[in-house]
Amino acid sequence: MHKLKLHGFNNLTKSLSFCIYDICYTKTADDRDGYIAYIDEQYNANRLTEILTETCSIIGANVLNIARQDYDPQGASVTILVSEEPIDPRDVDTSEHPGPLPNSVVAHLDKSHICVHTYPESHPEGGLCTFRADIEVSTCGVISPLKALNYLIHQLESDIVTIDYRVRGFTRDINGVKHFIDHQINSVQNFMSEDMKSLYHMMDVNVYQENIFHTKMLLKDFDLKHYLFNVNPEELSAAERKRITDLLYHEMQEIYYGRNLPVL
């Protein structure tokens, strides 16, 4: 897509929001409480602040203010208000390709924010526990927050990821013509590295005419030991391993497809 010569500031708002899920099986009530405490500590407000601050560095944003809070009995929230950095928009790469991990990318932001909220969850029946983190990166300016997607998914290793990207508002060129998007995009997947895409099953649901792009991701490899908390697979009978595997698989399928499915 050719570069637009704009009249004034780029007023497009680009928002990336995604949910990441971590699934776990616990055998006892104590193990369930232990998992919730463990995951709550792993993703406390301080660690989330570090991740989001690095995200700001990747997209080149200035941190104006940080609000963070851990909750009782569990959960955490972090919101960072960021501002623009004065750069020449002609120097910004808007092509579709994966963003960097620790390297810096310039951005042009105004009244933008990055926020995350966590939701540990469990139920006394079945032994399943889930951890969900909701993340939103919203920017006004010349680049897409999708540049931070690669880094964030690498940092928050997950079993299931649902991603929504949308562009809202419009900007005008020097002739007064409105432009409702200023970069090419066919799929959110184009902003992910090949190694990441190889790890997940992916499905797109895009509404191109509305500038809405949706991608779902489900981890391909299933190793039971990675889903057990304080339980060794070798200590379980073959029948018990199959029962737990079926339980976990069914839970992940329901979350991935976003609906209740019949138990086979």
Swiss-Prot record:
Enzyme Commission number(s) from the entry: 4.1.1.50
Enzyme class, first EC level, given as a word: lyase
Record note on modification: Is synthesized initially as an inactive proenzyme. Formation of the active enzyme involves a self-maturation process in which the active site pyruvoyl group is generated from an internal serine residue via an autocatalytic post-translational modification. Two non-identical subunits are generated from the proenzyme in this reaction, and the pyruvate is formed at the N-terminus of the alpha chain, which is derived from the carboxyl end of the proenzyme.
Gene Ontology biological-process annotations: spermidine biosynthetic process
Active site: 112, 117, 140
Domain of life: Bacteria
GO molecular function: adenosylmethionine decarboxylase activity
KW Ligase (keyword) present: no
Protein name per its UniProtKB record: S-adenosylmethionine decarboxylase proenzyme
Gene: speD
